């Protein structure tokens, strides 16, 4: 009857459900599943028209196992930095027009305050040193 409730037509159906939280808990008790809590690196937004570049950078970083978040919205850099500090991000990536053209984003370590402009290839290793 569930299909009829949502789709207003009868259709044969079969289903199954598991309690995901219970499954994860059971796996953690058996020490076969560990949740690694990582804080995301934040990519700061300078121009919404560059979203494709931000997403490409995020894809590269996530593919390398780095938790990454693109700043959700359009705000001045100060607000974006406040957001990164609020979520306790270990670092931010400044990837504005000049950085996109040069292919060298600026990585700012939020713990030390140091920042450097580096190639995307080097970015992964530098972030891993920070996190």
Where would I find each of the regions flagged by the language model?
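TRNA-recognition modules of translation machinery and tRNA-sensing kinases, especially anticodon-binding
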Residues: 1-131
